[in-house]
UniProtKB/Swiss-Prot annotation:
GO terms for molecular function: ATP binding; magnesium ion binding; phenylalanine-tRNA ligase activity; tRNA binding. It catalyses: tRNA(Phe) + L-phenylalanine + ATP = L-phenylalanyl-tRNA(Phe) + AMP + diphosphate + H(+). It comes from Tropheryma whipplei (strain Twist) (Whipple's bacillus). SUPFAM superfamilies: Class II aaRS and biotin synthetases, tRNA-binding arm. GO terms for cellular component: cytoplasm. Binds 2 magnesium ions per tetramer. It is found in: Cytoplasm. Gene3D superfamilies: Bira Bifunctional Protein, Domain 2. Keywords: Aminoacyl-tRNA synthetase, ATP-binding, Cytoplasm, Ligase, Magnesium, Metal-binding, Nucleotide-binding, Protein biosynthesis. This is Phenylalanine--tRNA ligase alpha subunit. HAMAP family: Phe_tRNA_synth_alpha1 (MF_00281). Pfam families: Phe_tRNA-synt_N (PF02912), tRNA-synt_2d (PF01409). InterPro entries: aa-tRNA-synth_II, aa-tRNA-synth_II/BPL/LPL, Phe-tRNA-synth_IIc_asu, Phe-tRNA_ligase_II_N, Phe_tRNA_ligase_alpha1_bac, Phenylalanyl-tRNA_Synthase, tRNA-bd_arm.
Length: 336
């Protein structure tokens, strides 16, 4: 049939033209010319209804086959053109990953962690060991084993964050002192150890308090330990952190887990004093809880907050600056 030959010839020409197309715009135009509402295929489709019953299926099949071939060719060419354009873009935008950067945005360790490591190094160089304990602690180790009685105000929910269910007697530790008991029970004597980590209180965030902060605590248990050993240790640490010109004083105080107890303050001028931490000889009841022979062994303990220490070193007036992540604060510690 002449119609079949015409359709096949037009299809071949369309396929050849599609294979030579170089742009998506030209491909769209060619697709409309061959498959659009005014294309030659549309005219053949419209003419089928006036053909004889014998020709209708033959011409209809030829038109459908031509439309399928042209449509597939357009789709294949469209994909090829898009891939070529993408490859050309990649070639134009190739980056030399070995080139030296023109700008560097270095990070930095948080100043609390830097200070923590500095203090731990101080004790490691003196032969002390570093011990750790869990942040989720038992109420017995956090309070009872440290001679903190059942009616002590520190055990109120207004001061302590208890875990649910309350009957489990578990809490977020309020100090690092429970590590003392763990260290005394699991290590042979004499013992010289230091621990540091997060502690938790039900305190609002303000200039001098934060509900999550870091404590560092030292513990010694040996024969013939005295307050002189304690005072000398704290003085050496203060000189190491703040310089030889720093002033240190101790004031009598009360802590259930030490006896006698004291607080120690620091000052640069000897006039304005900053409370730094607490200390004392380990209470014999605490040593007994750990199974220590209190006739032959005594010990001392001291502890302080790292945030307050950092405030004194860098003359920071607001503790919130340390925890809120303000870039203007972080820049002075190397973060850019």
């Amino acid at each position: 049939m002449d119609e079949i030959q015409d359709i096949e010839g037009l299809t071949r020409r369309a396929l050849q033209a599609i294979s030579r197309i170089d742009t998506l715009r030209d491909l769209t135009k060619l697709k409309n010319d061959n498959l659009g509402s005014t294309s030659w295929l549309a005219k053949y489709s419209a003419s089928i209804k006036i053909l004889s019953q014998e020709k209708k299926p033959i011409i209809g099949k030829a038109v459908s086959e031509a439309r399928r071939k042209i449509l597939e060719a357009c789709q294949d060419r469209d994909l090829a053109l898009r891939l070529n354009a993408q490859n050309e873009q990649f070639t134009r935008e190739t980056l030399d990953i070995t080139a030296l950067p023109t700008r560097i945005f270095p990070g930095a360790r948080h100043p609390i962690h830097v200070l923590q490591d500095k203090i731990l190094d101080f004790f490691l160089m003196r032969g002390w060991s570093v011990v750790e304990g869990p942040e989720l602690e038992s109420e017995w180790l956090n309070f009872d084993a440290l001679n903190i009685g059942p009616f002590h105000p520190a055990r109120e929910e207004s001061d302590t964050i208890f875990a649910e269910p309350r009957s489990a007697s578990m809490l977020l530790r309020t100090h690092t002192s429970p590590v003392q008991l763990r260290a005394l029970v699991s290590n042979p004597l004499p013992l010289y150890c230091v621990s540091s980590g997060k502690v938790f209180r039900s305190d609002p965030l303000d200039a001098t308090h934060t509900p999550v902060f870091h404590q560092l605590e030292g513990l010694v248990c040996d024969r013939n330990i005295t307050l002189g050993h304690l005072k000398g240790t704290v003085e050496d640490l203060a000189g190491y952190l703040f310089g030889a010109e720093v002033n240190l004083r101790m004031r009598c105080n009360y802590f259930p887990f030490t006896e006698p107890s004291a607080e120690f303050d620091i000052s640069r001028d000897g006039i304005d004093w900053t409370e730094w931490g607490g200390c004392g000889l380990v209470n014999s009841k605490v040593l007994s809880m750990a199974g220590i022979d209190t006739v032959h062994y005594t010990g001392f303990a001291f502890g302080f907050g790292l945030e307050r220490t950092l405030q004194f070193i860098h003359s920071l007036s607001d503790m919130r600056d340390i925890v809120e992540g303000d870039i203007r604060f972080s820049q002075q510690f190397g973060l850019k």
